[in-house]
């Protein structure tokens, strides 16, 4: 039921052309929800190009899950020199480093870019983060079990990728979170809550 709810939520928010953050705890089915969404996305846009950026340690897992749950999905894992190829199937899976160093990936116009473990772009000053935020994309989805690791600025950076401008620029947001006023934090929750699906194993 959680995975079905997650899929329906993704479909609903994406129809509004908004960038969702799937922030469920690890083990609650984020991968399956994304794959179900991609199957529907492909039905709607047969010639679409989707880029999925993941940590290197998860490349194999994503490949296995694709074969298990969506065997008809046309996908390719691009690692090392493979990331420099220019011909892209419906779904291209690449590491953060691969996306940050591949001119072919950076020059492509993507219909959808998905980040797994999106906390990897928490530092806006790294080349990796800058390159990924500059990718040409029509839609974006982020996944992470830890949307706020050490600072609310981590959350700002993810939303700066998903919906640039939603939370203002980094300087304004930093000034905002420096305030401990409870009403301000409530206002922040009102802004971001519609874009975040966060479920815990303890729920």
Locate each region found by the language model.
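ASCE P-loop NTPase motor core, strongest for the SF2 helicase catalytic module
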Residues: 1-203
């Amino acid at each position: 039921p959680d995975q079905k709810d997650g899929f329906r939520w993704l479909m609903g928010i994406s129809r509004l052309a908004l960038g969702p953050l799937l922030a469920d705890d690890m083990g609650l089915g984020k991968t399956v929800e994304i794959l179900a969404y991609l199957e529907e996305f492909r039905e709607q846009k047969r010639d679409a190009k989707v880029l999925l950026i993941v940590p290197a340690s998860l490349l194999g897992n994503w490949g296995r899950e694709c074969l298990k749950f969506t065997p008809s999905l046309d996908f390719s894992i691009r690692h090392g020199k493979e990331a420099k190829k220019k011909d892209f199937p419906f779904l291209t899976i690449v590491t953060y480093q691969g996306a940050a160093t591949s001119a072919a990936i950076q020059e492509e116009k993507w219909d959808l870019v998905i980040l797994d473990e999106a906390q990897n772009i928490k530092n806006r000053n790294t080349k990796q983060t800058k390159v990924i935020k500059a990718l040409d994309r029509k839609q974006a989805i982020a996944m992470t079990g830890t949307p706020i690791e050490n600072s609310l600025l981590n959350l700002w950076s993810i939303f700066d990728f998903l919906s640039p401008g939603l939370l203002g620029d980094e300087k304004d947001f930093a000034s905002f979170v420096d305030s401990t006023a409870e009403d301000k934090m409530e206002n922040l929750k009102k802004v971001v809550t519609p874009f975040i699906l966060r479920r815990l194993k303890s729920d």
